[in-house]
Amino acid sequence: MKKALIWAALTLGISNFSFAADGSSAENGLVSVPSTHGVKETADKLESVLTSKGMTVFTRINHTEGAKKAGKELRETEVVLFGNPKVGTPLMQCSQTMAIDLPQKALVWQDANGAVWLSYNDPHYLASRHNIKDCDAAVAKVSGALAKFAKAATE
């Protein structure tokens, strides 16, 4: 029994942070995909693929520049806000509180080792957060689209 409990604890701990076959990882509702490009180039590529797929890019926030203005240092960090009512509205129809997490955001950042990542909120995590039921198709559609956008921007 003790061995079973220890094994279960280890399994749950390890499953809390996992890497997919494509190198992406998911932890606490955040999907992170490694990029082969720098932060600016990754964000530029993401913006390009988003607009080519009919998404609206509302803004790009360069947190590194903001930190400099405040006299602080921050590794390269940019956020891209984007969306499309045709995609977001079905999720909000499932649960109106989903609107707090829309439009979608993508974080492009450099870690302490110099690696660049593109991170975004996992739609399945958001569905759970907002207690969305019976909307699996809409959640899966958004999840698939975000994964494709991330792949196109990071390769």
Model-derived features: positions:
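Compact, glycine-rich, soluble single-domain proteins
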Residues: E47, T51, M55-Q104, V108
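C-terminal partner/receptor-binding element of secreted or periplasmic proteins
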Residues: H124-E155
